Amino acid sequence: DEAVDTFYSCTLCQSFAPNHVCIITPERSGLCGAYNWLDGKAAFQINPTGPNQPVKKGPAIDAFKGQWKDINEFVCAHSHKSLEIFNLYSFIEFPMTSCGCFECISCVLPSTNGVMTVYRAYPGMTPSCMKFSTLAGTVGGGVQTPGFIGHSKLYIESRKFISAEGGARRIVWMNRELKEAMEPALRGI
């Protein structure tokens, strides 16, 4: 993320989450897992008026948490002014909103001071005493939900994954299928 001055937006999900704006960076793909930074860049070149727009970072307000002046202004304008402050790398303070098509949900488990991460195909109960569908109802819809975040599966591999709170090392629970799929990446963390 530090190597570029421009990120890309994605507003494809605004038909069902009107106030949600995805900001896609080289180290953070779209929540759905379908768009990465290069996809956003290519989509803009193909359709300059489409849902993927370049967003200059501008001056850093808090680079550690992933907050930049111009990103905040863009998100505010494109979220119908419902979101004024936005941190890319924190899910506790002013996290990115979620639409509803995210692959995974991560949330704080207060009893462990850790984080649990669950994949959308997992039908069982999580340690938060909620199933994925209940968590999705809490997180989705384009509202900031401190302590909860929707994200792509590959974002877990990123060094920017909830880095303001300690990153993937804070994960204390994952459903088995996700853990097995992510095992090679998690071993390197």
Roles of regions detected by a PLM:
Residues 1-189:
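Cysteine-centered metal-binding/redox modules
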